[in-house]
């Protein structure tokens, strides 16, 4: 798109909106030299809504060592740490870019469970992904972009009822090569 505007909760993106948005990028962005526990401390210092106890619980469930330097973790475990940090905030808006893209299929279920059981009840969760089939069970709505424009914006129930297909099938049909 060449024009338009973006607002978050009625405000132009800036320092105030960063307080209510928890963003998980699709690429590793945390300093590799830091230990996991230092990252938890950093997030606690930066974000008033960060819950270090929640982060600790999730790290323990995944058997991730808080004392481990990030650089010693596998790619999948680094992504899990990033997800834990993002989901340990009580944000109003969670923007998750390809949260299951780099992890093995067995870990995907845990990640989806982590997302669903750790976001604030009054929050909105936006997940950007190409792995529609894996996240379809947790979707309420789907927005499909094609060549920079909204191709479709519908509830998943509407897609299933009116199109007679799953959201994944609808996606594949709309984006055939």
Residue ranges: model-predicted function:
Residues 108-121:
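Helical segment within the ABC ATPase nucleotide-binding domain
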Residues 123-131:
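Conserved H-loop
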Residues 153-154:
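ABC ATPase "signature
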Residues 23-81:
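ABC-family P-loop ATPase nucleotide-binding domains
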Residues 135-137:
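A short, surface-exposed alpha-helical micro-motif characterized by mixed small hydrophobic
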Residues 94-98, 103:
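Catalytic Walker B motif of ABC-type/P-loop ATPase nucleotide-binding domains
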Residues 3-17:
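Conserved ABC transporter NBD signature motif
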């Amino acid at each position: 798109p060449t024009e338009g505007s973006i607002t978050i909760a009625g405000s132009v993106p800036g320092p105030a909106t960063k307080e209510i948005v928890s963003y998980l990028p699709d690429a590793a962005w945390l300093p590799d030299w830091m230990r996991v526990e230092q990252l938890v401390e950093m997030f606690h210092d930066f974000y008033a809504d960060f819950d270090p106890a929640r982060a600790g619980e999730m790290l323990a469930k995944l058997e991730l060592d808080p004392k481990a330097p990030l650089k010693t973790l596998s790619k999948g475990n680094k992504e899990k740490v990033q997800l834990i940090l993002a989901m340990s905030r009580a944000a109003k808006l969670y923007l998750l870019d390809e949260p299951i893209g780099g992890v093995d299929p067995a870990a995907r279920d845990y990640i989806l469970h982590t997302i669903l059981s750790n976001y604030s009840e009054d929050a909105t969760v936006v997940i950007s992904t190409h792995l529609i089939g894996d996240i379809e069970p947790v979707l309420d709505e789907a927005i499909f972009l094609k060549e920079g424009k909204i191709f479709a914006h519908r509830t998943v129930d509407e897609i299933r009822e009116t199109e007679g297909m799953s959201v994944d099938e609808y996606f594949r049909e709309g984006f055939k090569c």
